[in-house]
Amino acid sequence: GCKKCGIPFEPTYLDSLIFAQNLLPELGKYKLDIVADHLQLPQFNHHRASDDAVPVAQMLAKFFVMLEERGVTRLQQINDEMTKLRPLGVKRNRFPKHIILIAKNKVGLKNLYQLISASNLKYFKRVPIIPKSELVAHREGLIIGSACEAGELFRAIVDHKDWNELKRIASFYDYLEIQPLGNNRFMVRDGTVRDDEDLKDFNRTVVKLGEELGKPVCATGDVHFLDPEDEVYRHILLASKKFADANEPVPLYFRTTDEMLKEFDYLGKEKAYEVVVTNTRAIAEQVEDIELLPKGKLFPPRLENSEEDLNRMVWGKAHELYGDDLPQLIVDRLNVELGSILGKYDVVYMSAQKLVQRSLECGYLVGSRGSVGSSLVAYMAGITEVNALPPHYRCPKCRNVEFHAGEYGCGADMPDKMCPVCGTKYAKDGFDIPFETFLGYGGGKVPDIDLNFSGEYQARAHAHAVEMFGKTQVFRAGTIGTLAEKTAYGFVKKYLEENGIAAGNAEIDRLTAGCVGVRRTTGQHPGGLVVVPDDMDIEDFCPVQHPADDPDSDTITTHFEYHCMEDNLLKLDMLGHDDPTMIRMLENLTGVNARAIPLDDPD
Protein backbone atom coordinates (compact mmCIF):
# COMPACT_ATOMS: atom_id res chain seq x y z
CA GLY A 1 0.00 0.00 0.00
CA CYS A 2 2.75 2.44 0.90
CA LYS A 3 4.55 1.66 -2.34
CA LYS A 4 1.44 2.41 -4.41
CA CYS A 5 1.06 5.72 -2.59
CA GLY A 6 4.72 6.60 -3.01
CA ILE A 7 5.37 6.51 0.73
CA PRO A 8 8.80 5.15 1.83
CA PHE A 9 8.32 2.18 4.15
CA GLU A 10 11.45 0.49 5.46
CA PRO A 11 10.73 -0.32 9.11
CA THR A 12 12.86 -2.38 11.44
CA TYR A 13 11.06 -5.68 11.93
CA LEU A 14 11.41 -8.52 14.40
CA ASP A 15 10.28 -12.12 13.92
CA SER A 16 8.55 -13.24 17.11
CA LEU A 17 8.67 -16.89 15.96
CA ILE A 18 12.48 -16.84 15.77
CA PHE A 19 12.56 -15.28 19.24
CA ALA A 20 10.35 -18.06 20.59
CA GLN A 21 12.35 -20.84 18.92
CA ASN A 22 15.67 -19.62 20.27
CA LEU A 23 14.65 -18.30 23.68
CA LEU A 24 12.26 -21.16 24.48
CA PRO A 25 13.97 -24.24 22.96
CA GLU A 26 12.27 -26.55 25.44
CA LEU A 27 8.83 -25.99 23.89
CA GLY A 28 9.37 -27.87 20.63
CA LYS A 29 6.14 -26.45 19.13
CA TYR A 30 5.61 -22.73 18.61
CA LYS A 31 1.97 -22.09 17.76
CA LEU A 32 0.80 -18.76 19.11
CA ASP A 33 -1.49 -20.22 21.77
CA ILE A 34 1.21 -22.67 22.97
CA VAL A 35 3.78 -19.89 23.43
CA ALA A 36 1.18 -17.63 25.07
CA ASP A 37 0.24 -20.35 27.59
CA HIS A 38 3.91 -20.99 28.36
CA LEU A 39 4.48 -17.29 29.05
CA GLN A 40 1.25 -17.15 31.11
CA LEU A 41 -0.32 -14.44 28.97
CA PRO A 42 -4.02 -13.50 29.30
CA GLN A 43 -6.58 -15.46 27.28
CA PHE A 44 -7.32 -14.08 23.81
CA ASN A 45 -9.56 -14.76 20.82
CA HIS A 46 -7.19 -16.84 18.68
CA HIS A 47 -7.20 -16.59 14.85
CA ARG A 48 -8.52 -13.01 14.71
CA ALA A 49 -5.73 -10.80 13.38
CA SER A 50 -6.50 -7.85 15.64
CA ASP A 51 -6.73 -10.09 18.71
CA ASP A 52 -3.61 -12.07 17.80
CA ALA A 53 -1.56 -8.89 17.60
CA VAL A 54 -2.04 -8.17 21.31
CA PRO A 55 -0.40 -11.37 22.69
CA VAL A 56 2.41 -11.03 20.13
CA ALA A 57 3.18 -7.59 21.55
CA GLN A 58 3.02 -9.01 25.09
CA MET A 59 5.38 -11.82 24.07
CA LEU A 60 7.87 -9.35 22.66
CA ALA A 61 7.91 -7.48 25.96
CA LYS A 62 8.78 -10.72 27.77
CA PHE A 63 11.34 -11.65 25.12
CA PHE A 64 13.03 -8.26 25.54
CA VAL A 65 13.35 -8.92 29.29
CA MET A 66 15.01 -12.29 28.51
CA LEU A 67 17.39 -10.58 26.10
CA GLU A 68 18.28 -7.89 28.65
CA GLU A 69 19.19 -10.68 31.08
CA ARG A 70 21.62 -11.90 28.40
CA GLY A 71 23.15 -8.42 28.09
CA VAL A 72 21.31 -7.42 24.91
CA THR A 73 20.10 -3.83 25.12
CA ARG A 74 20.13 -2.66 21.47
CA LEU A 75 18.32 -3.88 18.37
CA GLN A 76 21.65 -4.19 16.55
CA GLN A 77 22.72 -6.90 19.03
CA ILE A 78 19.71 -9.16 18.49
CA ASN A 79 20.84 -10.98 15.33
CA ASP A 80 24.19 -11.90 16.87
CA GLU A 81 22.48 -13.16 20.01
CA MET A 82 20.03 -15.27 17.98
CA THR A 83 22.98 -16.85 16.17
CA LYS A 84 24.61 -17.74 19.50
CA LEU A 85 21.37 -19.22 20.83
CA ARG A 86 20.45 -21.18 17.72
CA PRO A 87 22.82 -24.14 18.32
CA LEU A 88 21.32 -24.54 21.79
CA GLY A 89 17.78 -24.32 20.50
CA VAL A 90 16.08 -25.64 17.39
CA LYS A 91 19.17 -25.40 15.15
CA ARG A 92 17.18 -24.73 12.01
CA ASN A 93 16.21 -22.33 9.32
CA ARG A 94 12.57 -22.77 8.42
CA PHE A 95 13.06 -22.27 4.69
CA PRO A 96 16.67 -22.98 3.72
CA LYS A 97 17.70 -22.12 0.17
CA HIS A 98 20.36 -23.59 -2.07
CA ILE A 99 23.59 -21.74 -2.77
CA ILE A 100 26.83 -22.37 -4.66
CA LEU A 101 30.15 -21.80 -2.87
CA ILE A 102 33.43 -21.94 -4.81
CA ALA A 103 36.78 -21.65 -3.02
CA LYS A 104 39.09 -19.51 -5.12
CA ASN A 105 42.19 -19.82 -2.91
CA LYS A 106 43.46 -21.46 0.29
CA VAL A 107 41.76 -18.84 2.47
CA GLY A 108 38.48 -19.58 0.75
CA LEU A 109 39.03 -23.32 1.09
CA LYS A 110 39.46 -23.05 4.86
CA ASN A 111 36.42 -20.79 5.11
CA LEU A 112 34.45 -23.32 3.06
CA TYR A 113 35.54 -26.12 5.38
CA GLN A 114 34.59 -24.05 8.44
CA LEU A 115 31.15 -23.39 6.96
CA ILE A 116 30.66 -27.10 6.24
CA SER A 117 31.71 -27.96 9.81
CA ALA A 118 29.33 -25.39 11.29
CA SER A 119 26.47 -26.51 9.04
CA ASN A 120 26.90 -30.10 10.22
CA LEU A 121 27.64 -29.54 13.90
CA LYS A 122 25.68 -26.41 14.84
CA TYR A 123 22.87 -25.95 12.35
CA PHE A 124 21.99 -29.41 11.06
CA LYS A 125 18.26 -30.09 10.65
CA ARG A 126 17.56 -32.89 8.18
CA VAL A 127 20.24 -31.29 6.00
CA PRO A 128 23.30 -29.13 6.80
CA ILE A 129 22.28 -25.45 6.93
CA ILE A 130 24.45 -22.31 6.80
CA PRO A 131 22.96 -19.15 8.35
CA LYS A 132 23.59 -16.09 6.22
CA SER A 133 25.39 -14.44 9.13
CA GLU A 134 27.93 -17.30 9.15
CA LEU A 135 28.34 -17.03 5.39
CA VAL A 136 29.05 -13.30 5.63
CA ALA A 137 31.59 -13.89 8.41
CA HIS A 138 33.45 -16.49 6.29
CA ARG A 139 33.04 -14.90 2.87
CA GLU A 140 36.71 -14.11 2.20
CA GLY A 141 38.15 -16.24 -0.59
CA LEU A 142 34.75 -17.57 -1.68
CA ILE A 143 32.79 -17.01 -4.88
CA ILE A 144 29.05 -17.16 -4.16
CA GLY A 145 26.56 -18.18 -6.84
CA SER A 146 22.77 -17.90 -6.73
CA ALA A 147 22.27 -21.62 -7.50
CA CYS A 148 19.30 -23.40 -9.06
CA GLU A 149 15.51 -23.01 -8.82
CA ALA A 150 15.83 -23.77 -5.09
CA GLY A 151 18.07 -20.73 -4.64
CA GLU A 152 16.97 -17.53 -2.94
CA LEU A 153 16.95 -15.40 -6.09
CA PHE A 154 15.07 -17.79 -8.36
CA ARG A 155 12.44 -18.44 -5.67
CA ALA A 156 11.93 -14.70 -5.29
CA ILE A 157 11.43 -14.36 -9.05
CA VAL A 158 8.92 -17.23 -9.08
CA ASP A 159 7.13 -15.57 -6.13
CA HIS A 160 6.90 -12.31 -8.16
CA LYS A 161 8.84 -10.17 -5.68
CA ASP A 162 9.14 -6.54 -6.74
CA TRP A 163 12.16 -5.33 -8.69
CA ASN A 164 13.84 -3.54 -5.80
CA GLU A 165 13.59 -6.67 -3.66
CA LEU A 166 15.06 -8.77 -6.48
CA LYS A 167 17.95 -6.32 -6.79
CA ARG A 168 18.53 -6.45 -3.05
CA ILE A 169 18.68 -10.25 -3.11
CA ALA A 170 20.84 -10.47 -6.25
CA SER A 171 23.34 -7.92 -4.93
CA PHE A 172 24.53 -10.44 -2.32
CA TYR A 173 25.89 -12.86 -4.93
CA ASP A 174 29.11 -12.75 -6.93
CA TYR A 175 27.46 -14.29 -9.97
CA LEU A 176 23.90 -15.19 -10.95
CA GLU A 177 22.85 -18.51 -12.47
CA ILE A 178 20.40 -19.55 -15.15
CA GLN A 179 19.76 -23.15 -16.15
CA PRO A 180 18.26 -25.13 -19.05
CA LEU A 181 14.47 -25.16 -19.31
CA GLY A 182 14.36 -28.93 -18.79
CA ASN A 183 15.80 -28.51 -15.30
CA ASN A 184 12.74 -26.50 -14.22
CA ARG A 185 10.03 -28.00 -16.44
CA PHE A 186 8.55 -29.67 -13.36
CA MET A 187 7.05 -26.22 -12.66
CA VAL A 188 4.95 -26.58 -15.80
CA ARG A 189 3.83 -30.05 -14.74
CA ASP A 190 2.83 -28.95 -11.24
CA GLY A 191 1.07 -25.79 -12.45
CA THR A 192 3.49 -23.25 -10.97
CA VAL A 193 3.90 -21.72 -14.45
CA ARG A 194 1.91 -22.03 -17.66
CA ASP A 195 4.57 -23.05 -20.16
CA ASP A 196 8.22 -22.86 -21.23
CA GLU A 197 7.80 -19.19 -22.09
CA ASP A 198 7.31 -18.40 -18.40
CA LEU A 199 10.51 -20.31 -17.62
CA LYS A 200 12.34 -18.30 -20.28
CA ASP A 201 11.03 -15.10 -18.71
CA PHE A 202 12.46 -16.16 -15.35
CA ASN A 203 15.89 -16.57 -16.94
CA ARG A 204 15.51 -13.26 -18.81
CA THR A 205 14.79 -11.59 -15.46
CA VAL A 206 18.04 -12.99 -14.03
CA VAL A 207 19.94 -11.71 -17.08
CA LYS A 208 18.37 -8.26 -16.70
CA LEU A 209 19.31 -8.19 -13.00
CA GLY A 210 22.89 -9.07 -13.90
CA GLU A 211 23.07 -6.27 -16.45
CA GLU A 212 21.63 -3.68 -14.07
CA LEU A 213 23.82 -4.71 -11.12
CA GLY A 214 26.97 -5.47 -13.12
CA LYS A 215 26.91 -9.11 -11.97
CA PRO A 216 28.06 -11.87 -14.36
CA VAL A 217 25.28 -14.27 -15.33
CA CYS A 218 26.43 -17.87 -15.88
CA ALA A 219 24.54 -20.68 -17.58
CA THR A 220 25.00 -23.84 -15.50
CA GLY A 221 23.62 -27.36 -15.77
CA ASP A 222 23.02 -28.37 -12.12
CA VAL A 223 24.70 -31.59 -13.21
CA HIS A 224 23.80 -34.74 -11.25
CA PHE A 225 25.01 -37.38 -13.74
CA LEU A 226 27.30 -37.54 -16.75
CA ASP A 227 25.30 -38.80 -19.74
CA PRO A 228 21.58 -38.56 -20.61
CA GLU A 229 21.16 -42.33 -20.40
CA ASP A 230 22.43 -42.26 -16.79
CA GLU A 231 19.16 -40.65 -15.69
CA VAL A 232 17.67 -44.08 -15.03
CA TYR A 233 20.15 -44.64 -12.17
CA ARG A 234 18.86 -41.49 -10.50
CA HIS A 235 15.27 -42.71 -10.92
CA ILE A 236 16.17 -46.02 -9.25
CA LEU A 237 17.93 -44.33 -6.33
CA LEU A 238 15.12 -41.79 -5.79
CA ALA A 239 12.54 -44.58 -5.92
CA SER A 240 14.47 -46.43 -3.20
CA LYS A 241 14.07 -43.30 -1.03
CA LYS A 242 10.29 -43.27 -1.70
CA PHE A 243 10.28 -40.00 -3.66
CA ALA A 244 6.85 -39.54 -5.23
CA ASP A 245 8.34 -37.89 -8.33
CA ALA A 246 11.17 -40.40 -8.74
CA ASN A 247 10.24 -41.10 -12.37
CA GLU A 248 9.77 -37.50 -13.49
CA PRO A 249 12.24 -36.67 -16.28
CA VAL A 250 14.88 -34.18 -15.13
CA PRO A 251 17.73 -33.94 -17.68
CA LEU A 252 20.50 -33.02 -15.24
CA TYR A 253 23.30 -34.41 -17.41
CA PHE A 254 26.60 -32.78 -18.39
CA ARG A 255 25.81 -30.83 -21.54
CA THR A 256 28.38 -29.89 -24.17
CA THR A 257 29.07 -26.25 -24.99
CA ASP A 258 27.06 -26.52 -28.21
CA GLU A 259 24.13 -28.03 -26.32
CA MET A 260 24.24 -25.20 -23.78
CA LEU A 261 24.39 -22.54 -26.52
CA LYS A 262 21.34 -24.09 -28.15
CA GLU A 263 19.50 -24.15 -24.79
CA PHE A 264 19.88 -20.39 -24.41
CA ASP A 265 19.49 -19.25 -28.02
CA TYR A 266 16.30 -17.38 -27.01
CA LEU A 267 18.58 -14.81 -25.34
CA GLY A 268 20.20 -14.02 -28.68
CA LYS A 269 23.45 -15.35 -30.09
CA GLU A 270 25.77 -12.87 -28.35
CA LYS A 271 24.10 -13.06 -24.95
CA ALA A 272 23.96 -16.87 -25.11
CA TYR A 273 27.72 -17.00 -25.79
CA GLU A 274 28.32 -14.55 -22.94
CA VAL A 275 26.43 -16.59 -20.32
CA VAL A 276 27.60 -20.00 -21.55
CA VAL A 277 31.26 -19.31 -22.36
CA THR A 278 32.57 -15.85 -21.49
CA ASN A 279 31.22 -15.47 -17.96
CA THR A 280 31.80 -19.07 -16.89
CA ARG A 281 35.42 -18.82 -18.00
CA ALA A 282 35.78 -15.54 -16.09
CA ILE A 283 34.59 -17.23 -12.89
CA ALA A 284 36.89 -20.22 -13.46
CA GLU A 285 39.88 -17.91 -14.01
CA GLN A 286 39.39 -16.45 -10.53
CA VAL A 287 40.07 -19.85 -8.99
CA GLU A 288 43.70 -20.62 -8.16
CA ASP A 289 45.23 -24.08 -8.46
CA ILE A 290 44.69 -25.37 -4.92
CA GLU A 291 46.41 -28.42 -3.52
CA LEU A 292 43.84 -29.83 -1.14
CA LEU A 293 46.29 -32.06 0.74
CA PRO A 294 50.07 -31.88 0.13
CA LYS A 295 51.10 -35.29 -1.14
CA GLY A 296 53.43 -37.18 1.20
CA LYS A 297 53.81 -34.29 3.67
CA LEU A 298 53.04 -35.26 7.26
CA PHE A 299 51.90 -32.61 9.74
CA PRO A 300 52.60 -34.43 13.02
CA PRO A 301 51.39 -33.12 16.37
CA ARG A 302 53.94 -32.10 18.95
CA LEU A 303 55.04 -34.15 21.94
CA GLU A 304 57.57 -32.42 24.12
CA ASN A 305 61.10 -33.84 23.66
CA SER A 306 59.79 -36.71 21.52
CA GLU A 307 62.93 -36.84 19.36
CA GLU A 308 65.33 -36.91 22.30
CA ASP A 309 63.17 -39.31 24.30
CA LEU A 310 62.86 -41.81 21.44
CA ASN A 311 66.58 -41.72 20.68
CA ARG A 312 67.49 -42.19 24.35
CA MET A 313 64.91 -44.94 24.88
CA VAL A 314 65.99 -46.94 21.81
CA TRP A 315 69.72 -46.91 22.53
CA GLY A 316 69.10 -47.54 26.22
CA LYS A 317 67.03 -50.64 25.47
CA ALA A 318 69.55 -51.85 22.89
CA HIS A 319 72.38 -51.69 25.43
CA GLU A 320 70.16 -53.32 28.08
CA LEU A 321 69.53 -56.32 25.81
CA TYR A 322 72.73 -56.60 23.76
CA GLY A 323 75.51 -55.18 25.91
CA ASP A 324 77.56 -52.03 26.19
CA ASP A 325 79.51 -52.87 23.04
CA LEU A 326 76.68 -53.38 20.57
CA PRO A 327 77.16 -55.67 17.56
CA GLN A 328 77.77 -53.61 14.42
CA LEU A 329 74.72 -55.14 12.75
CA ILE A 330 72.47 -53.65 15.44
CA VAL A 331 74.25 -50.28 15.39
CA ASP A 332 73.91 -50.03 11.61
CA ARG A 333 70.25 -51.07 11.66
CA LEU A 334 69.31 -48.57 14.36
CA ASN A 335 71.25 -45.76 12.67
CA VAL A 336 69.42 -46.38 9.39
CA GLU A 337 66.02 -46.48 11.05
CA LEU A 338 66.56 -43.53 13.36
CA GLY A 339 67.92 -41.51 10.44
CA SER A 340 64.55 -41.89 8.72
CA ILE A 341 62.47 -41.42 11.87
CA LEU A 342 64.00 -38.68 14.03
CA GLY A 343 62.82 -35.21 13.11
CA LYS A 344 60.02 -36.59 10.93
CA TYR A 345 58.13 -39.44 12.53
CA ASP A 346 59.37 -39.48 16.13
CA VAL A 347 55.97 -38.25 17.37
CA VAL A 348 54.30 -41.18 15.62
CA TYR A 349 56.55 -43.60 17.50
CA MET A 350 56.39 -41.85 20.86
CA SER A 351 52.61 -41.49 20.82
CA ALA A 352 52.29 -45.23 20.13
CA GLN A 353 54.86 -45.99 22.83
CA LYS A 354 52.96 -43.97 25.43
CA LEU A 355 49.65 -45.61 24.53
CA VAL A 356 51.12 -49.12 24.69
CA GLN A 357 52.97 -48.43 27.93
CA ARG A 358 49.82 -47.10 29.63
CA SER A 359 47.88 -50.19 28.56
CA LEU A 360 50.62 -52.50 29.89
CA GLU A 361 50.60 -50.62 33.19
CA CYS A 362 46.86 -51.30 33.39
CA GLY A 363 47.48 -55.01 32.84
CA TYR A 364 46.44 -55.36 29.20
CA LEU A 365 48.77 -56.58 26.45
CA VAL A 366 48.67 -54.72 23.14
CA GLY A 367 48.91 -56.49 19.81
CA SER A 368 50.87 -54.71 17.09
CA ARG A 369 49.24 -55.27 13.72
CA GLY A 370 50.69 -54.93 10.25
CA SER A 371 54.24 -54.03 9.25
CA VAL A 372 55.36 -52.17 12.39
CA GLY A 373 57.08 -55.40 13.46
CA SER A 374 59.69 -54.75 10.76
CA SER A 375 60.98 -51.72 12.69
CA LEU A 376 63.72 -52.48 15.21
CA VAL A 377 63.17 -49.01 16.69
CA ALA A 378 59.54 -49.96 17.42
CA TYR A 379 60.77 -53.10 19.21
CA MET A 380 63.33 -51.19 21.27
CA ALA A 381 60.68 -48.59 22.15
CA GLY A 382 58.32 -51.27 23.42
CA ILE A 383 55.68 -50.70 20.72
CA THR A 384 55.88 -54.22 19.33
CA GLU A 385 57.07 -57.59 20.63
CA VAL A 386 58.39 -58.55 17.18
CA ASN A 387 62.18 -58.29 16.90
CA ALA A 388 63.09 -57.58 13.26
CA LEU A 389 66.75 -58.67 13.57
CA PRO A 390 67.96 -61.91 11.94
CA PRO A 391 67.52 -65.06 14.09
CA HIS A 392 69.93 -64.97 17.02
CA TYR A 393 70.74 -66.17 20.50
CA ARG A 394 70.88 -63.58 23.27
CA CYS A 395 72.07 -64.19 26.82
CA PRO A 396 69.73 -62.48 29.31
CA LYS A 397 72.53 -62.42 31.91
CA CYS A 398 75.84 -61.49 30.28
CA ARG A 399 74.24 -60.17 27.03
CA ASN A 400 76.40 -62.28 24.75
CA VAL A 401 74.93 -62.53 21.21
CA GLU A 402 75.19 -65.11 18.41
CA PHE A 403 73.58 -64.37 15.01
CA HIS A 404 72.51 -67.18 12.67
CA ALA A 405 71.29 -65.31 9.61
CA GLY A 406 70.05 -67.54 6.79
CA GLU A 407 70.10 -70.75 8.83
CA TYR A 408 66.62 -70.48 10.35
CA GLY A 409 63.33 -68.77 9.49
CA CYS A 410 63.08 -67.15 12.90
CA GLY A 411 64.66 -67.37 16.34
CA ALA A 412 61.91 -69.58 17.72
CA ASP A 413 62.92 -72.30 15.21
CA MET A 414 66.46 -72.58 16.62
CA PRO A 415 67.36 -75.35 19.07
CA ASP A 416 67.86 -74.50 22.73
CA LYS A 417 71.42 -73.56 23.66
CA MET A 418 73.41 -72.48 26.71
CA CYS A 419 75.54 -69.35 26.72
CA PRO A 420 79.20 -70.43 26.39
CA VAL A 421 80.30 -67.40 28.40
CA CYS A 422 78.23 -67.70 31.58
CA GLY A 423 76.27 -70.93 31.17
CA THR A 424 72.83 -69.26 31.21
CA LYS A 425 70.15 -70.54 28.85
CA TYR A 426 70.01 -68.37 25.75
CA ALA A 427 66.90 -66.40 24.79
CA LYS A 428 65.97 -67.04 21.14
CA ASP A 429 64.75 -64.10 19.09
CA GLY A 430 64.70 -62.45 15.66
CA PHE A 431 62.26 -62.67 12.74
CA ASP A 432 64.52 -61.29 10.01
CA ILE A 433 62.23 -58.56 8.59
CA PRO A 434 63.76 -55.70 6.57
CA PHE A 435 62.95 -52.16 7.73
CA GLU A 436 61.85 -51.21 4.20
CA THR A 437 58.68 -53.25 4.80
CA PHE A 438 57.56 -50.45 7.12
CA LEU A 439 58.91 -47.16 5.79
CA GLY A 440 59.75 -48.15 2.22
CA TYR A 441 63.08 -47.74 0.43
CA GLY A 442 64.78 -44.56 1.60
CA GLY A 443 62.33 -44.19 4.49
CA GLY A 444 59.90 -42.13 2.43
CA LYS A 445 56.70 -43.94 3.39
CA VAL A 446 54.58 -42.42 6.18
CA PRO A 447 54.51 -44.93 9.08
CA ASP A 448 51.19 -46.45 10.07
CA ILE A 449 51.24 -48.11 13.48
CA ASP A 450 48.16 -50.28 14.05
CA LEU A 451 47.51 -51.44 17.61
CA ASN A 452 45.00 -53.93 18.99
CA PHE A 453 43.87 -52.99 22.49
CA SER A 454 41.64 -54.96 24.78
CA GLY A 455 37.99 -54.21 24.08
CA GLU A 456 37.63 -53.50 27.80
CA TYR A 457 40.43 -50.95 27.66
CA GLN A 458 39.88 -49.35 24.22
CA ALA A 459 37.80 -46.42 25.47
CA ARG A 460 40.49 -45.60 28.05
CA ALA A 461 43.16 -45.77 25.34
CA HIS A 462 41.19 -43.29 23.24
CA ALA A 463 40.80 -41.03 26.28
CA HIS A 464 44.57 -41.20 26.82
CA ALA A 465 45.14 -40.07 23.22
CA VAL A 466 42.82 -37.10 23.79
CA GLU A 467 44.67 -36.36 27.03
CA MET A 468 48.01 -36.36 25.17
CA PHE A 469 47.03 -34.07 22.29
CA GLY A 470 43.99 -32.12 23.48
CA LYS A 471 40.26 -32.51 22.95
CA THR A 472 40.13 -29.92 20.17
CA GLN A 473 42.86 -31.67 18.16
CA VAL A 474 41.66 -35.30 18.14
CA PHE A 475 38.84 -36.53 15.89
CA ARG A 476 37.40 -39.89 14.93
CA ALA A 477 38.40 -41.06 11.46
CA GLY A 478 35.41 -40.76 9.16
CA THR A 479 34.26 -43.38 6.68
CA ILE A 480 31.89 -43.28 3.71
CA GLY A 481 29.45 -46.13 3.23
CA THR A 482 28.54 -46.83 -0.38
CA LEU A 483 25.83 -48.86 -2.05
CA ALA A 484 26.79 -52.54 -2.12
CA GLU A 485 26.09 -54.77 -5.12
CA LYS A 486 23.42 -56.88 -3.39
CA THR A 487 21.58 -53.80 -2.14
CA ALA A 488 21.77 -52.13 -5.55
CA TYR A 489 20.45 -55.31 -7.17
CA GLY A 490 17.48 -55.22 -4.79
CA PHE A 491 16.78 -51.57 -5.65
CA VAL A 492 16.87 -52.35 -9.37
CA LYS A 493 14.58 -55.38 -9.09
CA LYS A 494 12.04 -53.45 -7.01
CA TYR A 495 12.12 -50.46 -9.37
CA LEU A 496 11.52 -52.65 -12.43
CA GLU A 497 8.75 -54.54 -10.66
CA GLU A 498 6.93 -51.42 -9.43
CA ASN A 499 7.06 -49.85 -12.89
CA GLY A 500 6.08 -52.98 -14.79
CA ILE A 501 9.33 -53.07 -16.75
CA ALA A 502 10.55 -56.39 -18.16
CA ALA A 503 14.34 -56.68 -18.29
CA GLY A 504 16.79 -59.48 -18.98
CA ASN A 505 19.67 -60.43 -16.72
CA ALA A 506 22.17 -58.40 -18.75
CA GLU A 507 20.08 -55.22 -18.37
CA ILE A 508 19.55 -55.85 -14.66
CA ASP A 509 23.31 -56.29 -14.22
CA ARG A 510 23.95 -53.06 -16.15
CA LEU A 511 21.53 -51.08 -14.00
CA THR A 512 22.96 -52.62 -10.84
CA ALA A 513 26.53 -51.73 -11.85
CA GLY A 514 25.45 -48.13 -12.43
CA CYS A 515 24.16 -47.83 -8.86
CA VAL A 516 26.99 -49.65 -7.05
CA GLY A 517 29.41 -47.37 -5.21
CA VAL A 518 27.03 -44.44 -4.77
CA ARG A 519 27.52 -42.78 -1.39
CA ARG A 520 24.86 -43.98 1.01
CA THR A 521 25.90 -42.87 4.47
CA THR A 522 28.84 -41.80 6.60
CA GLY A 523 30.31 -43.50 9.63
CA GLN A 524 33.40 -43.80 11.76
CA HIS A 525 36.40 -46.10 11.78
CA PRO A 526 36.00 -48.53 14.71
CA GLY A 527 39.33 -47.52 16.22
CA GLY A 528 40.86 -44.75 14.13
CA LEU A 529 41.69 -41.34 15.58
CA VAL A 530 43.06 -38.43 13.55
CA VAL A 531 45.33 -35.95 15.35
CA VAL A 532 45.84 -32.35 14.21
CA PRO A 533 48.91 -30.30 15.26
CA ASP A 534 48.16 -27.82 18.04
CA ASP A 535 49.13 -24.85 15.85
CA MET A 536 46.61 -25.82 13.16
CA ASP A 537 42.86 -26.40 12.87
CA ILE A 538 41.15 -29.49 11.51
CA GLU A 539 39.69 -27.22 8.80
CA ASP A 540 43.21 -26.73 7.47
CA PHE A 541 42.72 -30.28 6.18
CA CYS A 542 39.02 -31.08 6.03
CA PRO A 543 35.62 -30.27 7.57
CA VAL A 544 34.11 -32.32 10.39
CA GLN A 545 30.64 -33.70 11.10
CA HIS A 546 28.66 -36.16 13.19
CA PRO A 547 28.66 -39.74 11.84
CA ALA A 548 25.60 -40.70 9.76
CA ASP A 549 24.34 -37.10 10.08
CA ASP A 550 23.23 -37.84 13.65
CA PRO A 551 23.00 -34.47 15.44
CA ASP A 552 22.53 -36.23 18.80
CA SER A 553 25.87 -38.05 18.56
CA ASP A 554 28.73 -36.83 20.76
CA THR A 555 31.24 -38.15 18.22
CA ILE A 556 32.86 -35.81 15.70
CA THR A 557 34.41 -37.38 12.60
CA THR A 558 36.37 -36.16 9.62
CA HIS A 559 34.07 -35.20 6.73
CA PHE A 560 36.47 -36.82 4.28
CA GLU A 561 37.19 -40.52 4.20
CA TYR A 562 40.27 -40.86 6.40
CA HIS A 563 42.41 -42.75 3.86
CA CYS A 564 42.82 -39.59 1.77
CA MET A 565 44.56 -37.86 4.71
CA GLU A 566 46.72 -40.65 6.11
CA ASP A 567 49.85 -39.18 4.51
CA ASN A 568 49.18 -35.79 6.10
CA LEU A 569 47.86 -36.35 9.61
CA LEU A 570 48.83 -38.70 12.41
CA LYS A 571 46.27 -41.49 12.48
CA LEU A 572 46.13 -43.64 15.57
CA ASP A 573 44.65 -47.01 14.63
CA MET A 574 43.45 -48.30 18.01
CA LEU A 575 41.07 -51.19 17.53
CA GLY A 576 39.39 -53.12 20.31
CA HIS A 577 39.99 -56.89 20.24
CA ASP A 578 39.04 -59.85 22.39
CA ASP A 579 42.51 -61.47 22.44
CA PRO A 580 44.19 -59.07 24.92
CA THR A 581 41.14 -59.39 27.18
CA MET A 582 41.24 -63.19 27.09
CA ILE A 583 45.00 -63.25 27.70
CA ARG A 584 44.55 -61.09 30.79
CA MET A 585 41.80 -63.41 32.05
CA LEU A 586 44.00 -66.46 31.49
CA GLU A 587 46.90 -64.79 33.30
CA ASN A 588 44.61 -64.05 36.25
CA LEU A 589 43.30 -67.62 36.30
CA THR A 590 46.66 -69.40 35.91
CA GLY A 591 49.12 -66.96 37.41
CA VAL A 592 51.31 -67.39 34.30
CA ASN A 593 52.81 -64.33 32.60
CA ALA A 594 51.92 -64.66 28.92
CA ARG A 595 55.05 -62.78 27.86
CA ALA A 596 57.24 -65.34 29.64
CA ILE A 597 55.94 -68.28 27.57
CA PRO A 598 58.51 -69.30 24.91
CA LEU A 599 57.19 -69.30 21.34
CA ASP A 600 58.54 -72.83 20.83
CA ASP A 601 56.88 -74.18 23.99
CA PRO A 602 55.37 -77.53 22.85
CA ASP A 603 52.63 -77.25 25.50
Where are these regions (language model features)?
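Helix-rich "cap/lid" substructures immediately adjacent to catalytic or cofactor-binding pockets
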Residues: D324-G367
